[in-house]
């Protein structure tokens, strides 16, 4: 039986209100507040009409990190649209879910330089300052992209810009054209590192201009962080996952 990751009525507004102050400040900006109100109205209407919306915790990527805590940003597009998959963290699924193809390619790339991750739940990355943010935070069952163009992009663009404004050094991993379009939100003089490649989907991972396969982004990220006196990310995920599992339960 899949994990019940369905969004409950009124949960989206409650979770937004419970976000850390630094993120709530972004949501309170006038243009962002209007966009979020539009999203919220649409989501609640669809739930009232009987639609199944995922995930149960749309803002989970923000729950554990303030902007100043973020060291790496990985952008996804919208949540997985099957039952029991989406967790509120881009690319991540529960450990008992079959590994999605894009995540499998991510693990393959990590395994070039580090031990291959054994868990599909990427919570350990979040504990180390990796923001796993989709640009649309909700989706309807079996309908990819169903909540795109509803206002989420305005909300998540503002969140990305807030992270980029923070002066602590960060790496932005932009995979695919959708993520790369967000590079404009990262000022060139901000002192951050931007690495771009194709999306890890099997449809594009080996294609030019910059194949995801062989991109070396995980190694490059750690080298850059270490040059700035920061700890490398344990991409294998083992050091934090086991002891923190309960905290990240859906």
UniProtKB/Swiss-Prot annotation:
Pfam families membership? UDG
Of the GO CC terms on this record, one is:
cytoplasm
Q: Give compartment(s).
A: Cytoplasm
Supply the name of the protein: Uracil-DNA glycosylase
Q: Where is the active site?
A: 78 (proton acceptor)
Family in the record: Belongs to the uracil-DNA glycosylase (UDG) superfamily. UNG family.
Q: Which Gene3D superfamilies does the UniProt entry name for this protein?
A: Uracil-DNA glycosylase-like domain
Gene name for this UniProt entry: ung
The EC number(s) attached to this protein equal 3.2.2.27
What's the catalysed reaction? Hydrolyzes single-stranded DNA or mismatched double-stranded DNA and polynucleotides, releasing free uracil
What the entry lists under SMART domains is as follows: UDG, UreE_C
Q: Which NCBIfam families match?
A: PRK05254.1-1 (NF003588), PRK05254.1-2 (NF003589), PRK05254.1-4 (NF003591), PRK05254.1-5 (NF003592), ung (TIGR00628)
What's an example of a GO molecular-function annotation for this chain?
uracil DNA N-glycosylase activity
User: Which key words are in the record?
Assistant: Cytoplasm, DNA damage, DNA repair, Hydrolase
SUPFAM superfamilies reported in the protein's UniProt record:
Uracil-DNA glycosylase-like
Q: What does this protein do?
A: Excises uracil residues from the DNA which can arise as a result of misincorporation of dUMP residues by DNA polymerase or due to deamination of cytosine.
Q: Which domain of life, per UniProt?
A: Bacteria
A single BP term in Gene Ontology: base-excision repair, AP site formation via deaminated base removal
Question: Which InterPro entries does the UniProt record give?
Answer: UDG_fam1, Ura-DNA_Glyclase_AS, Uracil-DNA_glycosylase-like, Uracil-DNA_glycosylase-like_sf
Is Cytoplasm given among the entry's keywords?
yes
How would you classify this enzyme at the top EC level?
A: hydrolase
Q: Where is this region: Disordered?
A: 228-250
């Amino acid at each position: 039986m899949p994990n019940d990751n369905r969004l409950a009525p009124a949960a989206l507004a409650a979770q937004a209100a419970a976000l850390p102050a630094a993120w709530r400040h972004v949501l309170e900006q006038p243009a962002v507040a209007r966009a979020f109100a539009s999203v919220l109205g649409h989501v609640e209407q669809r739930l009232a009409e009987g639609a199944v919306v995922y995930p149960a915790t749309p803002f989970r990527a923000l729950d554990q990190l303030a902007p100043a805590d973020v060291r790496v940003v990985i952008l996804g597009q919208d949540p997985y649209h099957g039952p029991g998959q989406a967790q509120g963290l881009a690319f991540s699924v529960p450990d008992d879910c079959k590994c999605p193809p894009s995540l499998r390619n991510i693990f393959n790339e990590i395994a070039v330089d580090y031990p291959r991750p054994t868990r599909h739940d990427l919570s350990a990355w979040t504990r180390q300052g990796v923001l796993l943010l989709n640009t649309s935070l909700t989706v309807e069952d079996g309908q990819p992209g169903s909540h795109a163009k509803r206002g989420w992009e305005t909300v998540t663009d503002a969140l990305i810009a807030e992270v980029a404004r923070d002066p602590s050094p960060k790496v932005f991993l932009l995979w695919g054209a959708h993520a790369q379009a967000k590079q404009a939100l990262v000022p060139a003089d901000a002192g951050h590192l931007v690495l771009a490649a194709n999306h890890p989907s099997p449809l594009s991972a080996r294609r030019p201009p910059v194949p995801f396969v062989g991109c070396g982004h995980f190694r490059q990220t750690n080298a850059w962080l270490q040059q700035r006196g920061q700890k490398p990310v344990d991409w294998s995920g083992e050091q934090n996952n086991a002891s923190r599992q309960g905290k990240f339960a859906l």
